[in-house]
Design a protein with these regions (language model features):
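Structured binding/interaction patches within domain cores
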Residues: 2-164
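Mature, well-folded catalytic/scaffold domains that follow N-terminal targeting or propeptide regions
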Residues: 153, 157-158, 173-183
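A recognition module on extended beta-rich or small alphabeta surfaces enriched in W/G with H and D/E
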Residues: 163-175
């Protein structure tokens, strides 16, 4: 794929051109995980152009929106709606990376104002997904936060972690399959 499709950020584009991307990427979130499934996911995500990767991350975050609790459902929905609009504008190249980052900071209020740990990390799944429209590296962090939520929901349940990773992989394969048909 062309470097400009792979990454919109110059640093990530240069890493792609010089082939210095290493998988698996280091964890940025402390989680109990199936590292083989995570690597499998990353290998698929690596083949998606950034626009599709961002769409994948946002779609992957949808199941976690209902877990976000900031004590004010109206405010939560307003923040999510505004952030979605900024994300879509960025994908249409109508928003600069800076404007998207500002929207991401607003979305981060969902995490800061969370009423419990599950709500906090569910919000981070969403915030990192939105940020994928700025930098690719946020996609795997979003996916890892999804695993963090599953860790909190059921302590010591590796099967729940595997199910979540398999769901992420199926969704990524769907996006990869759709990308092939676009060409």
């Amino acid at each position: 794929m062309k470097p400009e499709d792979y990454a919109w950020n110059e640093f990530e584009r240069t890493s792609y051109k010089t082939k210095i991307n290493r998988l698996p990427s280091p964890y940025k979130v402390a989680i109990w995980d199936d590292s083989e499934k995570r690597l499998e996911l990353e290998q698929i995500l690596e083949r998606l152009p950034q626009k599709e990767l961002a769409r994948w991350a946002l779609e992957n975050s949808r199941d976690f929106l209902s877990l976000i609790d900031i004590g004010d459902e109206g405010e939560k929905n307003k923040i999510i709606r505004q952030t979605y609009e900024a994300f879509d504008a960025r994908l249409r190249n109508e928003f600069s990376p800076h404007e998207l980052r500002k929207a991401g900071f607003t979305a981060n209020l969902l995490s800061k104002n969370a009423q419990n740990q599950i709500a906090k990390y569910a919000a981070r799944v969403f915030v990192q997904a939105i940020s994928t429209a700025h930098m690719r590296g946020h996609a795997i962090v979003s996916a890892d936060y999804a695993i963090k939520v599953r860790n909190l929901q059921e302590v010591d349940k590796l099967e729940l972690v595997r199910q979540e990773r398999e769901k992420q992989i199926r969704l990524a394969e769907f996006f990869l399959g759709n990308e092939k048909y676009k060409r």
